[in-house]
Amino acid sequence: MQDASEPVINMPALPMNSVNEQHDRHEDLPEVGTTSVTKIINDSDNEDDENGMDLGRVASESLEGDAVVSIDINTEDSSLSPAKQENEKSPEGIEQKYQEEDLKDDKKSNETIATPVPDAASRASLEKQKSGLTNLEKSTHVVLIKCIEQLIQIKVCMKNEKMKNLMEQLKPLLQTECQFDKFLIVELFQYCFESSQDEVMNISLDTISKLASFAYFSSKDKTPASFGPPKSLLQCMVDMVCDSINDEVVDGNLQLNVVKALSAFILCSEQDSMLHGAILLNSVRKLFNVFLLGDSDTIQSVAQASLTQAVTVVYERLRASHTQSNSTSALPEEDASVTENWVHDEDEPDKKITLHSMASAGTSSLDHVKVDADDPAVTSVENSSIQDAFLVFRSMCRLAVRQTSPDKVSNIRSQAMRAKLISLHLIYRILEKNSDLFMDPTLQFRGIPALKGMTLVHASRQYICLVLSRNAVSPVPQVFEVCCDIFYLMVFSLRAHFKQEIEVFFREVYFPMLDLKNTSYNQKLHTLLIIQRICLNPRALVELYINYDCDRSSTTNVFEQLLFSISKVTTNGPSETISEDIEEILPSLESSERSSTPFLNTNSASLKSEVVQLTTFSDFQLKLKTLQCVLDILQSLSNWAESGLYLSRRGVSTDEQGFVGDYDALSRSDTPVTNPYYNGKQSFEANSHSSSSIALADPSQFESNKQRKKLLRTCINKFNYKPTRGLKMLSENEYVDINDPKAIAEFLFRADGIDKTTLGDYLGEGDEKSISVMHEFIDCLSFINLKFVDALRRLLQCFRLPGEAQKIDRIMLKFSERYMKENPSAFANADTAYILAYSIILLNTDLHSPRIKNKMTKEDFIKNNRGINDGADLDEDYLGFVYDDILKNEIAMKDDQELAAIAPLMNNFSTSSGFTTFTSNGRDLQRVACIQASEEMANKATSVLKKLLYQQKHGSQKTNVYYNATHFEHIGPMLEATWMPILAALSNPLQNSDYVNELNMCLDGFQLVVRIACLFDLDLIRDAFIKTLTNFTNLHSTSEIKLRNTMVIKTLLRIASTEGNNLKDSWKDILTIISQLERVQLIGVGVDETEVPDVINARVRRKNVNIGSSNSIRHVSGSTSRSTRTRSLSKPLSPEAVSELMSTEVVLSIDRIFTQTSSLSGSAIVSFFKALCEVSWDEITSSSDLEQPRLYSLQKLVEISYYNMQRIRVEWSSIWNVLGRFFNMVGSDENRHVAVFALDSLRQLSMHFLEIEELSLFSFQKEFLKPFEYVMASDTVVEVKELVLQCVKQMIQAKISKIKSGWKTLFGVFTFAAKARSEILISMTFDTLVNLFSEHYDTLMQQNCLIDMLISFTELCKNGTNQKISLQSLEIIREVYSSLSTMIKEGLSSKPSVNETFSKYVFPVLFAYYDIIMSAEDLEVRSRALQNLFYIFLEESDDFTEETWEVVSRKFIFPIFSIFGPEADEATVMLRDEEIRTWQSTTLVEALRSLVTLLTRRFDKLHNLLKGYLWLFSNCICRDNITLSRIGTNCMQQLLSGNAYRFEVKDWNLVADMFIELFKETTPHQLLLLETFSNGQGAPVYSENENTQLSHKRGGSLPETSRSISTSSISPEKQMEFRSMIRKCILQLLLISIVAELLDNEEVFNHIPHEHVLKITVAIYDSWQFARKFNEDKSLRITLLNVGFMKQLPNLLRQETASALLYITLLFRLLKTRDPLGKTETDQKIHKLLFPVCAEMLDMYASLVVEKHTRNHAAWQPVIATILDSILNLPLELFSENIHTLYFSCCSMIAKENLDDQLRELLKNYFNRVGHILLNLNAQQE
């Protein structure tokens, strides 16, 4: 029994037209059939009527779980199955059972009264008999007669005269079957109810229920005027039944009969007898009250079942009427006037949305709209049905949101809580069974103007939100659970209409439920259950992502946050061992979808009052449930992706996938793919909106939005850290114009995530820009008609006031200005507002700061604010009101208040986690605090929803578009956004747990993540998850391998088998694990661990080899290695681990991985080979110190090569790029065993490759044979190289006909072998090459192997190890050329071009000879090669064209002398000094001589190359080697003298230019620069006797003191520079001698033009002037001596005299050969160049003092003698013309002491001739 003190919940009789406004779309769900709840008790004449089955007994038996035996209508089975018995324990089960019993009892009743009761359709078709009554009417008369007879037997009825008379009047009428007024029956029942006798009322109610089932009372029949206000008989009877019992405790049978009667009225299917509007609500209200106040649990259960049945019938009628009207009616147009009319705070239109906005909603203006009774649409069946459905739903919502006092909340069995629960359950049932009706856009209100065009979901939207916001955070488990179910329906079926609301509930309710520490176990568990059901829906997950995470207007990334919240539960789980059996936990973790409504009677077992305490066991349950959620998410994503890929492969476009998905189990389409949605309203303008929807339907557009949203978050975070940088970043990314303060202010005002403290500091800054932004920011607020304190509160909610007084001052100044602008009459001026605002801020700090002990009083506050209103005082009452307001309600940020409110849920109250068990003894403070925190969360949720709906009402319709999921491409970005929390959730159990089921869940999750990552090429994610798995294998520490590690290994093997095509670089980790696994298997069978080193640890050691940590370094050999291995054996491998790792499953899995490589794609097999090569190399290097290294992976590498032998050439080319490099390394490995195995494997593979015809094409043979060449070129041991040659020889012998492109590589092997220093290798190579030349020459020529063969023989010639083989190889090259010559001559008939013949046949042989000449180690070989080369040039070059000779000269002849060219590296020349000397003395001499012979013989064709050859000779002449210079001189002279007659003018011009250039390049001009020889400080070094030295005249010697002076240190650079100058001086002398000798040759002098001789003479004159200038600079020469470059005083006397002598000799010779009296320009030029210089030389010689310049005197004497002799030999005319130039110079010679006799004789002759000439002249004159 219920406590009588508890208030009865009376549901008000709401008007029929009371409705709400919302509009949304529908979604099809299966229809639910109608079942009967009430059992109609027949009162036939037999005794069974009185002893019939009672409703209460049936319900009671059903509630207690007893099996109720019923007879099926078809009498096929009289027993109930266990499943059916279980179903009858629920209200739905009772409904079904009652329906069966109703049918059975109706059948009995009809048989008793012999008048069958037809159904509605039959009754409508019956024809009245002529007697005037139908069979149905006769049946009703029987029931009425029975009732009257029972009433007559009751004394109370007979005492009532009116009632007695009425019964006596009615009975005959009923018996005679005459027509009568039905109001008489109503009047009879009225008398019965007025009697207040239970017996009478029970009979009446029983009769009424039967009449109602016969549709006896109609809404068309009206009561007479005398009865009161006119109303229908149907309403009159329903009111009587409802009023028959009150809210006090009454007889249980009477309550049951009332329930039965009301159920009969509600279930009546006749159109005129259906209940609508207020009548229906009145009936439902009475059923609701009976459920609450029922006399027993049985009555409450029956009332609950009847109430459920009534609600179900209302919606079934709506479905039926809509289905019927849909066939004839068209889709109505949406009424644009439909808007939402919640009561909003109009003063805060822009306030941030919080969760408090829903529950604080007031009444809707649509609750009192009037129905237009004249509109025919109002009276239609469909319109009546939709109104009934809405009214019932709204009533349930209103009952569900009623506030409940805390003491009632603690009593779950109280009327208030039971009323809330039944309401919530009915709401859930309505939404679950009829969601398609709610969303059907064709089902709209039509008869009510205010509701016209609305759908059910539109009208009910605010009520659904209100219900959830008020109850979603309830601490009562039952309430929270059903709210979770309702929210799931919102997400599952209605998410397109509740886009923003879903985000709010996730953000404000369900995410905090998982994140906060102290939410109860029940709340966390049911939240996870609902999330799990959402996770099972792939489309819902994808739509959550694209509509929230990819929506730039959404503040919450729902999908991403969902994974983060789930992962927190997983990672925060218990670490201690669970004592309970894990198998007991698993059944409780199933996803519980609500299948039936539980009984909610007072003593129901489903009403438990306690909240389950969180324990280690329950924490573990939550952890498992969280893992299951993660697994379901991954499975859904995988299914969606695979389904989309499957459809795309079938050619189905992405736009069609949403429709095809309806037939695909993997992508179930629970969201209809129709039109886009805006603000929850479907757009009927399909054409206008489809374009924008399609534009954003591209996955790349969603990802662009996602990235843009992420970038905005980054910018805001940057602003929160550094405002100026954040604004700059926002401007750079075009979020805001940094030059527009208004734009910045609006962005800061509306953007989410802005740190309010940072914002306050920025707005308070004193710079001009910040002040402008602050002004615009405050202007965004509206203070119209707001109280001053409220306006200040609104301002300070936008940002946190900075602490600096100047910043506060600036903000308050602007605030006061803004407030007074919008409220000009508030104060006298803005100064008043400014001072008061500042005063209020100080007051708020004073009153609420815990640091201030002496608080400000009201009087102090009033006193402080006197005279601020323009000199006047503000009203004291007003200031007192302000003081009280601040005292009671602190000005604080709402965020701080909300955080403080939910603090009990964030912090642990005690050491135990979660809630403590609520006890009945006293008030639990923890429980109260948590309830208050939950209430605060609910308030926040309702506030958010309120503001959300306000924004939807006043915002743009197209700002909130809901997109359906149609693309599988979203899955990749979804995983990218959430892989980190997924990894955290899945990794934690692998580290700590030993439970198989939990581990299996985690490993399944890993597999799914890798699968998705592989599908979308997410390399980072794939590698991260696979590396995580490899870390959990523990194969690097065999003693620690446990069951979970073996499970991880098996998972990795499964991943390798299933995802091989997409693993890419992750193959390395998997194959490393396989290698480690093979190592563990060997250890398990008894192999010493030291013989199988650990690959992973070895790799770590190599990586950390430079780190000095002893823990990370292990030496490869020595005692350290042995001791380390010994320690690793301290803990042997467990037998269980060995058994698992050596199981058949593992072995077959490994084999399957390798055998399945043949089915991998082209790119995947390359990745596999690459990874296996790396692992194999790790094995080899880790065991390099062992005699038998690990070759497991190398063996597998060869094995899979055989598996994949049938792949096409393109794929093998890619594979061999990897495999070839690997064989290069292993083939040249230091360990002989490794190299031998690799080479033998390579030989076998090569044999197979050669057999494949396709691989012989192009260059693949060359590639797969490359490792042989690489090994031969490496520094490996000779034995390995011998093996290479043997392998190559075997392949040639066995497969020579198959070798095509591989010849190039094979000859490469021979080439590198020919370079070896081993005579064995050289001998093997020579024998093989000779055999190929002699036996297979034609084959090699066909394969174009001439060049390769010549290169091999060339290398043998160059190798000086075996001279005999070198000379034999050289002879073979000669034979090759001979055969080529014969072939060329025989092929002349085809007339190939000379250039083609040369390049194809001759050029390779010439290059071979050239290479031998330049590089051969043996001089004999060089000489013979040179002879052979020039033999070809001299004897076999008749067909060479000038172009051919040009090529030969530039490619072969000139490079022979290039080592001495200016481009040669001096250091190289110095290092090869010995070789050069040998070369110069042998080969080069012979080459130069042969070259002269060649030029002489082939001068006609080489004429154009003369310049190059002259350069070649000059280059040899200019070397510092005297021998080479002389040879060059001789060759030059021989060339010029022997071919002078062939030279043309241009050729002589080249010769002259050559000599001029040589003189110029070899002149050391730097020698004349004094700073060149400075001591490093910019000043030359002089001796202390410098003045004395400088006073000496030309040619004087230095005193001894100067030689004893210490010299400065000379740098190597200075020394090298001076040596270079000395070499140039020597070259000058050599050039002078060359020119002299060359021009002494009469053949040359006669053919060289005189103009070119003059050019050479000018160069010689410059050389003379340079030497003269140096010799005259005494100070420079002394400097050179002091610095230390020379041991004696340097001079250039030889150069000076030699050049002077050559100069005058050439000029006198030119004069001699020309006309003495010639007047040509050349003659005049010779005269000018000769005679003045002669006079100058004579004067210089005359000035020399013999005693001081003895050396100079002697050197110049031949020059002077030559001058005088040549003058004397001049013709008379020329002699006479130049007497005036030379006479005085000769006179000065007479005065010279110790003059040589020769010179004296020459002077004598000169003066004699002069005298004769002068005397003859005088004589002639006389």
UniProtKB/Swiss-Prot annotation:
One protein family per Pfam: Sec7
Domain SEC7 as annotated: residue spans? 701-889
Q: Name one GO cellular component term.
A: Golgi trans cisterna
Following inactivation of the gene, the phenotype reported is: Sensitizes cells to tamoxifen (TAM).
> Domain of life, per the record?
Eukaryota
From the UniProt entry, list the residue stretches annotated as the region HDS1 domain: 898-1106
In this chain, the stretch annotated as Disordered covers 1-54, 66-126, 1111-1131, 1584-1610
Where in the sequence does UniProt note compositional bias of the Polar residues kind? 72-84
Tell me if Membrane is a UniProt keyword of this record.
yes
Notes on the domains? The homology upstream of Sec7 (HUS) box is necessary for the allosteric activation of Ssec71.
| Protein name per Swiss-Prot or TrEMBL | ADP-ribosylation factor guanine nucleotide-exchange factor sec72
Q: Which organism is it from?
A: Schizosaccharomyces pombe (strain 972 / ATCC 24843)
Q: Which gene encodes it?
A: sec72
